[in-house]
């Protein structure tokens, strides 16, 4: 029973009484404490994310889709507060749709990233949202932009984010190389996400992947037995 009760910090709540017996997830917001990733290759981008959504220590959803379409060839990966990131993504999708209608042409990936940056910076005191924007457009081809909490925007060859990213910085820095093919980027992303899911308690579930090129979007889901295995505990018996 003790394991199911919230651990109360000094001064934050009574140590005894009914309030002390409240599970921590009843007082926490739903969070996509997560691992997200995007990689640029010649001709497009690959995005990936785990699927676990938590409320404190409680797993609220095991199969969340954190790869959100913003336009036909533009997606974002969401980390942080589920409510905040959904609201920001919906607002940007709405604005980008109008922008595309006014110009009578597909929007640029940089435009979508700039909209995310403006909103995340303007409401930086109220939002808990870390976003990776990736997609393809006729002017620049495949592009990856990172908008971490606070509203900064930077273009990168690859980007990782979420609570699980701290476990895989060494792996992605050592493994990434320029000129990777789409299939190599898909495997690279799947391996990185699997490693993060092994170590991060807020990441888990299935792995969702998306490859965006001029021809369109290809999506796939890696279920439990398809997720790459690395640690001894998860390797099959000899």
From Swiss-Prot:
The listed locations are: Cytoplasm; Nucleus
Primary location group: cytoplasm
The molecular function terms in GO held by this entry are: threonine-type endopeptidase activity
Highest taxon in the source lineage: Eukaryota
Catalytic activity field: Cleavage of peptide bonds with very broad specificity
Give the quaternary structure.
Answer: The 26S proteasome consists of a 20S proteasome core and two 19S regulatory subunits. The 20S proteasome core is a barrel-shaped complex made of 28 subunits that are arranged in four stacked rings. The two outer rings are each formed by seven alpha subunits, and the two inner rings are formed by seven beta subunits. The proteolytic activity is exerted by three beta-subunits PSMB5, PSMB6 and PSMB7.
**Name the record gives this protein:** Proteasome subunit beta type-6
Q: Give the species this sequence originates from.
A: Mus musculus (Mouse)
């Amino acid at each position: 029973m003790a394991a199911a009760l919230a651990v109360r910090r000094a001064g934050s709540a009574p140590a005894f009484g009914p309030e002390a017996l409240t599970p921590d997830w009843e007082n926490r917001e739903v969070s996509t404490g997560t691992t997200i990733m995007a990689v640029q290759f010649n001709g497009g981008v690959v995005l990936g994310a785990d699927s676990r959504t938590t409320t404190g220590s409680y797993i609220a959803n095991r199969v969340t889709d954190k790869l959100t379409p913003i336009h036909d060839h533009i997606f974002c990966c969401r980390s942080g507060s589920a409510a905040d990131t959904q609201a920001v993504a919906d607002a940007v999708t709405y604005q980008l749709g109008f922008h595309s209608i006014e110009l009578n042409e597909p929007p640029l990936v940089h435009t979508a990233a700039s909209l995310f940056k403006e909103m995340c910076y303007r409401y930086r005191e109220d939002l808990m949202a870390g976003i990776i924007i990736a997609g393809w457009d006729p002017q620049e081809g495949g592009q990856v932009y990172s908008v971490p909490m606070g509203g900064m925007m930077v273009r990168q060859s690859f980007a990782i984010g979420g609570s699980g990213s701290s476990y895989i910085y060494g792996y992605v820095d050592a493994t990434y190389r320029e000129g990777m093919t789409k299939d190599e980027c898909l495997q690279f992303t799947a391996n990185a996400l699997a490693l993060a899911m092994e170590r991060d308690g807020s990441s888990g579930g299935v792995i969702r992947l998306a490859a965006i090129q001029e021809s369109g979007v290809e999506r796939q889901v890696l279920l439990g037995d398809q997720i790459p295995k690395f640690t001894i505990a998860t390797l099959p018996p000899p």
